[in-house]
Protein backbone atom coordinates (compact mmCIF):
# COMPACT_ATOMS: atom_id res chain seq x y z
CA UNK A 1 0.00 0.00 0.00
CA UNK A 2 1.15 3.52 -0.69
CA UNK A 3 2.25 5.35 2.43
CA UNK A 4 1.00 8.90 2.78
CA UNK A 5 3.79 11.45 3.07
CA UNK A 6 3.05 14.86 4.56
CA UNK A 7 5.51 17.67 3.81
CA UNK A 8 5.34 20.80 5.93
CA UNK A 9 6.59 23.32 3.42
CA UNK A 10 9.21 25.92 4.29
CA UNK A 11 10.99 28.72 2.42
CA UNK A 12 13.97 28.08 0.22
CA UNK A 13 16.56 30.00 2.28
CA UNK A 14 18.40 31.38 -0.77
CA UNK A 15 15.25 32.56 -2.56
CA UNK A 16 12.81 30.71 -4.74
CA UNK A 17 13.30 32.56 -8.00
CA UNK A 18 16.91 31.83 -8.95
CA UNK A 19 18.20 28.74 -10.73
CA UNK A 20 21.87 27.95 -11.29
CA UNK A 21 24.05 25.16 -12.53
CA UNK A 22 23.81 22.23 -14.92
CA UNK A 23 20.84 19.87 -14.98
CA UNK A 24 21.77 16.48 -13.52
CA UNK A 25 22.37 13.84 -16.19
CA UNK A 26 20.77 10.70 -14.75
CA UNK A 27 23.75 8.66 -15.98
CA UNK A 28 25.57 10.27 -13.04
CA UNK A 29 22.87 9.78 -10.43
CA UNK A 30 24.37 9.42 -6.95
CA UNK A 31 23.83 10.07 -3.27
CA UNK A 32 24.65 13.77 -3.82
CA UNK A 33 22.51 14.07 -6.96
CA UNK A 34 19.48 11.85 -7.27
CA UNK A 35 17.06 13.71 -9.58
CA UNK A 36 17.29 15.74 -12.82
CA UNK A 37 17.44 19.18 -11.21
CA UNK A 38 20.09 21.93 -11.25
CA UNK A 39 22.44 22.54 -8.33
CA UNK A 40 20.40 25.57 -7.30
CA UNK A 41 16.83 24.69 -8.21
CA UNK A 42 14.75 27.63 -6.96
CA UNK A 43 11.91 25.65 -5.35
CA UNK A 44 10.64 25.19 -1.83
CA UNK A 45 10.94 21.69 -0.39
CA UNK A 46 7.19 21.18 -0.86
CA UNK A 47 7.32 22.27 -4.49
CA UNK A 48 10.27 19.98 -5.12
CA UNK A 49 8.38 17.07 -3.53
CA UNK A 50 5.39 17.72 -5.81
CA UNK A 51 7.68 17.81 -8.83
CA UNK A 52 9.36 14.54 -7.84
CA UNK A 53 5.98 12.81 -7.65
CA UNK A 54 4.37 14.63 -10.60
CA UNK A 55 7.25 13.90 -12.98
CA UNK A 56 7.33 10.27 -11.82
CA UNK A 57 10.93 10.40 -10.64
CA UNK A 58 10.10 8.01 -7.79
CA UNK A 59 9.09 4.43 -8.40
CA UNK A 60 6.00 3.58 -6.40
CA UNK A 61 5.50 7.25 -5.55
CA UNK A 62 3.85 7.92 -2.19
CA UNK A 63 0.55 9.66 -1.59
CA UNK A 64 1.84 13.18 -1.14
CA UNK A 65 0.25 15.95 0.87
CA UNK A 66 2.00 19.33 1.07
CA UNK A 67 0.98 21.74 3.81
CA UNK A 68 1.43 25.08 2.08
CA UNK A 69 3.15 28.12 3.55
CA UNK A 70 1.41 31.41 4.10
CA UNK A 71 2.79 34.81 3.12
CA UNK A 72 6.00 33.58 1.48
CA UNK A 73 7.30 35.70 -1.37
CA UNK A 74 9.60 33.82 -3.77
CA UNK A 75 11.87 36.85 -3.88
CA UNK A 76 12.49 36.72 -0.12
CA UNK A 77 15.75 35.72 1.49
CA UNK A 78 15.36 33.65 4.63
CA UNK A 79 16.31 36.54 6.90
CA UNK A 80 13.41 38.53 5.44
CA UNK A 81 10.83 35.98 6.58
CA UNK A 82 11.10 36.69 10.30
CA UNK A 83 11.88 33.03 10.95
CA UNK A 84 14.79 31.94 13.14
CA UNK A 85 17.79 30.43 11.37
CA UNK A 86 18.35 26.74 12.10
CA UNK A 87 21.50 25.22 10.64
CA UNK A 88 20.56 22.80 7.84
CA UNK A 89 24.01 21.27 8.24
CA UNK A 90 26.80 21.62 10.85
CA UNK A 91 28.94 23.51 8.34
CA UNK A 92 26.22 25.89 7.16
CA UNK A 93 25.95 28.14 10.22
CA UNK A 94 24.36 31.16 8.54
CA UNK A 95 22.53 32.41 5.46
CA UNK A 96 25.60 33.71 3.63
CA UNK A 97 27.20 30.29 3.90
CA UNK A 98 24.04 28.72 2.47
CA UNK A 99 24.30 31.08 -0.51
CA UNK A 100 28.00 30.41 -1.05
CA UNK A 101 27.70 26.64 -0.62
CA UNK A 102 26.18 25.60 -4.00
CA UNK A 103 29.35 26.70 -5.77
CA UNK A 104 32.02 26.26 -3.14
CA UNK A 105 30.98 22.71 -2.24
CA UNK A 106 32.56 21.78 -5.59
CA UNK A 107 35.95 22.22 -3.92
CA UNK A 108 35.21 19.00 -2.06
CA UNK A 109 36.19 17.23 -5.29
CA UNK A 110 39.67 18.80 -5.13
CA UNK A 111 42.71 18.74 -2.84
CA UNK A 112 41.99 22.26 -1.51
CA UNK A 113 40.77 22.95 2.01
CA UNK A 114 37.23 24.32 1.60
CA UNK A 115 37.11 26.06 4.98
CA UNK A 116 36.14 22.98 6.96
CA UNK A 117 37.98 23.00 10.26
CA UNK A 118 37.47 26.76 10.65
CA UNK A 119 34.66 29.00 11.85
CA UNK A 120 33.99 30.01 8.24
CA UNK A 121 33.40 26.81 6.25
CA UNK A 122 32.99 27.42 2.50
CA UNK A 123 33.53 31.16 3.00
CA UNK A 124 37.25 30.56 2.74
CA UNK A 125 39.52 28.12 0.97
CA UNK A 126 43.24 27.53 0.83
CA UNK A 127 46.34 25.35 0.77
CA UNK A 128 49.92 25.69 2.05
CA UNK A 129 51.23 26.28 -1.48
CA UNK A 130 48.86 29.09 -2.57
CA UNK A 131 50.11 32.64 -3.14
CA UNK A 132 47.03 34.28 -1.65
CA UNK A 133 47.90 37.85 -2.62
CA UNK A 134 48.39 36.90 -6.27
CA UNK A 135 45.26 34.72 -6.30
CA UNK A 136 43.04 37.38 -4.73
CA UNK A 137 44.23 39.92 -7.29
CA UNK A 138 43.47 37.57 -10.15
CA UNK A 139 40.01 36.67 -8.82
CA UNK A 140 39.09 40.31 -8.22
CA UNK A 141 40.20 41.31 -11.73
CA UNK A 142 37.45 39.13 -13.24
CA UNK A 143 34.88 41.32 -11.47
CA UNK A 144 32.44 38.52 -10.73
CA UNK A 145 29.09 40.00 -9.69
CA UNK A 146 28.36 40.71 -6.04
CA UNK A 147 31.62 39.46 -4.54
CA UNK A 148 35.10 40.45 -3.43
CA UNK A 149 38.01 38.19 -2.53
CA UNK A 150 40.55 38.92 0.20
CA UNK A 151 43.72 37.02 1.11
CA UNK A 152 43.68 35.14 4.43
CA UNK A 153 45.90 32.75 6.36
CA UNK A 154 44.40 30.12 8.64
CA UNK A 155 44.96 26.68 10.19
CA UNK A 156 42.22 24.04 9.81
CA UNK A 157 41.66 21.96 12.96
CA UNK A 158 39.24 19.38 14.27
CA UNK A 159 36.04 21.06 15.51
CA UNK A 160 33.64 18.99 17.56
CA UNK A 161 30.43 18.42 15.64
CA UNK A 162 31.73 20.21 12.54
CA UNK A 163 35.01 18.83 11.22
CA UNK A 164 37.13 15.72 11.70
CA UNK A 165 40.48 15.52 9.89
CA UNK A 166 39.88 18.47 7.54
CA UNK A 167 42.14 18.80 4.52
CA UNK A 168 45.55 20.19 5.61
CA UNK A 169 44.69 19.68 9.28
CA UNK A 170 46.99 21.69 11.59
CA UNK A 171 48.88 23.14 8.63
CA UNK A 172 49.13 26.81 7.72
CA UNK A 173 46.88 27.46 4.73
CA UNK A 174 47.19 30.55 2.61
CA UNK A 175 44.00 31.26 0.80
CA UNK A 176 41.01 33.41 0.04
CA UNK A 177 37.97 34.59 1.97
CA UNK A 178 34.78 35.29 0.05
CA UNK A 179 33.01 38.52 0.90
CA UNK A 180 29.50 38.90 -0.51
CA UNK A 181 28.91 42.52 -1.53
CA UNK A 182 25.49 42.14 -3.15
CA UNK A 183 23.69 38.86 -2.55
CA UNK A 184 21.00 39.62 -5.12
CA UNK A 185 23.50 39.34 -7.98
CA UNK A 186 25.89 36.82 -6.43
CA UNK A 187 26.11 33.77 -8.72
CA UNK A 188 27.17 30.93 -6.46
CA UNK A 189 27.76 28.13 -8.95
CA UNK A 190 29.44 30.33 -11.55
CA UNK A 191 31.77 31.78 -8.90
CA UNK A 192 32.69 28.33 -7.62
CA UNK A 193 33.47 27.10 -11.13
CA UNK A 194 35.59 30.15 -11.91
CA UNK A 195 37.59 29.70 -8.70
CA UNK A 196 38.33 26.09 -9.66
CA UNK A 197 39.26 27.10 -13.21
CA UNK A 198 41.72 29.71 -11.96
CA UNK A 199 43.25 27.37 -9.35
CA UNK A 200 43.77 24.80 -12.11
CA UNK A 201 45.48 27.40 -14.29
CA UNK A 202 47.63 28.85 -11.49
CA UNK A 203 48.77 25.56 -9.97
CA UNK A 204 48.77 22.88 -12.71
CA UNK A 205 51.28 20.72 -10.82
CA UNK A 206 49.71 21.01 -7.37
CA UNK A 207 45.97 21.51 -7.75
CA UNK A 208 44.14 18.21 -8.29
CA UNK A 209 40.54 17.54 -9.32
CA UNK A 210 39.02 14.15 -8.56
CA UNK A 211 37.19 13.72 -11.86
CA UNK A 212 34.70 11.11 -10.67
CA UNK A 213 33.80 13.10 -7.58
CA UNK A 214 33.50 16.35 -9.55
CA UNK A 215 31.17 14.73 -12.09
CA UNK A 216 28.98 13.53 -9.21
CA UNK A 217 28.81 17.02 -7.71
CA UNK A 218 28.20 18.77 -11.03
CA UNK A 219 25.83 16.10 -12.30
CA UNK A 220 27.36 16.20 -15.78
CA UNK A 221 30.55 15.02 -17.46
CA UNK A 222 31.62 18.46 -18.63
CA UNK A 223 34.99 18.93 -16.94
CA UNK A 224 36.31 20.69 -20.04
CA UNK A 225 34.51 23.80 -18.77
CA UNK A 226 37.48 24.34 -16.45
CA UNK A 227 39.55 25.15 -19.53
CA UNK A 228 37.57 28.37 -19.92
CA UNK A 229 38.23 31.65 -18.11
CA UNK A 230 36.03 33.25 -17.12
CA UNK A 231 33.27 30.64 -17.17
CA UNK A 232 29.83 31.86 -18.22
CA UNK A 233 27.24 29.23 -17.31
CA UNK A 234 24.55 30.78 -19.49
CA UNK A 235 26.55 29.95 -22.60
CA UNK A 236 27.24 26.36 -21.48
CA UNK A 237 24.14 24.98 -19.77
CA UNK A 238 20.46 25.57 -20.43
CA UNK A 239 17.80 25.07 -17.77
CA UNK A 240 14.87 26.25 -19.91
CA UNK A 241 13.10 22.87 -19.85
CA UNK A 242 13.46 22.58 -16.08
CA UNK A 243 12.21 26.13 -15.56
CA UNK A 244 9.13 25.52 -17.71
CA UNK A 245 8.35 22.15 -16.14
CA UNK A 246 8.81 23.39 -12.57
CA UNK A 247 6.20 26.13 -13.10
CA UNK A 248 3.50 23.46 -12.82
CA UNK A 249 4.45 22.87 -9.20
CA UNK A 250 4.77 26.44 -7.97
Stretch-by-stretch model annotation:
Residues 2-4:
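A short helix->loop->beta-strand "cap" motif at the edges of active sites that frequently abuts
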Residues 6-28:
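Glycine-rich, charge-decorated loop segments at or immediately adjacent to ligand/cofactor-binding or catalytic sites
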Residues 8-11, 69-70, 127, 181:
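Active-site-proximal beta-strand/loop segments in catalytic clefts of secreted hydrolases
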Residues 29-102:
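Conserved anion/nucleotide-ligand pocket segment
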Residues 72-148, 156-157:
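Glycine-rich, aromatic-lined ligand/substrate-binding cores of catalytic
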Residues 126-240:
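Conserved functional hotspot residues or short segments at active or partner-binding sites
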Amino acid sequence: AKIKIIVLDRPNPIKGNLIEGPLLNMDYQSFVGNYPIPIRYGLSIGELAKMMVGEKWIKGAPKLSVIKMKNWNRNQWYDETGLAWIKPSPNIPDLNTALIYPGMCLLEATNINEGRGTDKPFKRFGAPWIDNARLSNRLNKIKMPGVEFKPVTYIPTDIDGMAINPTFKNKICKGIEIKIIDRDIYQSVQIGLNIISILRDEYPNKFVINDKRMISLLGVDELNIFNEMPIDLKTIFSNINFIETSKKYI
